[in-house]
Amino acid sequence: MQIPFSSSTSSSLGIEWELQLVDQQSRELRGEATLILDELRAKVGEREAAKAKHELFESTVEVITGVCGSVGEATADLAGTVSLLRDLAERRGVGLMCSGTHPTSDYAGQRITDDNRYSRLVSQMQWLARRLLIFGVHVHVGVRSPDKAMPIMNALMVYIPHFLALSASSPFWLGGDTGLASSRSQVFASLPTAGLPYPLEDWPRFESFMETLIAAGTIETIREVWWDIRPHPNFGTVELRICDGLPTLLEVGAVAALAQCLVDRMNTQIDRGYRLPTPQRWLVQENKWRAARYGLDAQILIDDRGGVRSVRDDLVDLVEDLLPVAHRLDCAQQLADVLVILETGASYTRQRAVARRADGDLTRVVDTLLEEMNTGRPVVAG
């Protein structure tokens, strides 16, 4: 089975941001996506409206950038679409926010979007699909050829805990504290074609694996492989999908800058004849769990002998190491915002601080998430 790979400009960028539609009175999720997207289409036309689309549930809208040359261009693109959606949503008494899970809303009461693809998913996966009331951020970074896509995907696996710890924003599920920094990552990983990617050596092996999955009836198309990192042949990108939903544009930009810089550096290393390392899958699995459980306080394994290091310290060093790349890509400020997240705390920390101050009232957490979306910056607990 041959899978064409659409070559794209190296280090070009695209971002997908899954937003929650929240009733401003009850603070619960509200299924208004079809109405809001229809109004957006009528207001700005099909081309611009294509930057916002349905997801599995009617209480979700995904905002998508075009192909961008820089992180600044991508976040400005997102901001423009979010502004249009916010105006339309607020007329209906609906607010926009983002976190890996809604703190209180129950998946059991959510309407599934009327779409054959989603109907098939629910029919096949049943309860696993019906509870996918989760929200993420996906970052696409362009690569020129499939020969680079697989080595870069494999090498990026070592950074899965870093991205998850930075973005972790789902401590609450159905009104209770899960004890995790990211419950979303654990919910999503329950799907048989989600979770960690398999370290396939090259593009022919990827093609062969996809052919096997289709022949076995596991998937109908390769779009149904939802790995934490995956190649996207249609876009000519490596797509990082591990991140929880990020509440602010500042955090979206920081994560996008980190992804762009890492892929750009790996692309350069391949051009110079360097063979990118592929981490052992068990080690990545353990580190992913540690990041999901402890967030930025995780101690991640750094070798196969049990050596560990703080993911926080690793991120500080990584930002410093990547700054020359970031300056060249014009995303040094956004990369430095990784350090802002380390200082203010990732969203799971901020949410818990709000809940503690409010004696466990999670509607106050929702209010803070709505505020963060509106201001574009983290609200620091005082």
From Swiss-Prot:
One of its GO terms (biological process) is modified amino acid biosynthetic process. Its EC number is 6.3.2.2. One of its GO terms (molecular function) is ATP binding. InterPro entries: GCL_type2/YbdK_subfam (IPR050141), GCS2 (IPR006336), Gln_synth/guanido_kin_cat_dom (IPR014746), YbdK (IPR011793). It catalyses: L-cysteine + L-glutamate + ATP = gamma-L-glutamyl-L-cysteine + ADP + phosphate + H(+). Keywords: ATP-binding, Ligase, Nucleotide-binding. PANTHER family: GLUTAMATE--CYSTEINE LIGASE 2-RELATED. ATP-dependent carboxylate-amine ligase which exhibits weak glutamate--cysteine ligase activity. Belongs to the glutamate--cysteine ligase type 2 family. YbdK subfamily. This is Putative glutamate--cysteine ligase 2-1. It comes from Frankia alni (strain DSM 45986 / CECT 9034 / ACN14a).
